[in-house]
Amino acid sequence: MKVLENLVYTKTHEWVRFEDETTALVGLTDYAQQTLGQLVFVNLPQEGDETVTGESFADVESVKAVSDVYCPVTGVVSEINEELLDAPEKINDTPYEAWFAKITDITEKEEFLSPEEYEEFVKKEME
């Protein structure tokens, strides 16, 4: 399982890369994609959609199941990664480059885990 130092993480296995205080990219962690298995479909939010911290804003379908992806910030979707619509396997291949959406006008943030805290959280979850 790969965890990058320049990101923060959630207990629902999303990663967040802040570009500044009110703009962030959101994606699924390496652990999440490994657990889900080969992804075959992704449903992304629409540009202009409002997001709410802790609520589902996308979903992914693997050969095993359909899973919600939760937004760790409240804001507005300013851009989606359209490449994922045609190639959801990019989430499996390069999870930390395969961002789902850019969220701007962020007004609320989830309590995030540092890379070290996330690694510990996953270890406990795997026990």
From Swiss-Prot:
Function: The glycine cleavage system catalyzes the degradation of glycine. The H protein shuttles the methylamine group of glycine from the P protein to the T protein.
Modification type N6-lipoyllysine: residues: K64
Necessary cofactors: (R)-lipoate
Keywords attached to this entry: Lipoyl
UniProt KW Repeat keyword: no
Cellular-component GO terms for this entry: cytosol; glycine cleavage complex
Family the entry assigns: Belongs to the GcvH family.
Taxon lineage: Bacteria, Bacillati, Bacillota, Clostridia, Lachnospirales
Lipoyl-binding domain boundaries: 23-104
Listed InterPro entries: Biotin_lipoyl, GCV_H, GCV_H/Fam206, GCV_H_sub, Single_hybrid_motif
Protein name as annotated: Glycine cleavage system H protein
Subunit structure and binding partners: The glycine cleavage system is composed of four proteins: P, T, L and H.
Keyword Zinc: no
Record-level GO BP terms: glycine decarboxylation via glycine cleavage system
Note describing how the cofactor binds: Binds 1 lipoyl cofactor covalently.
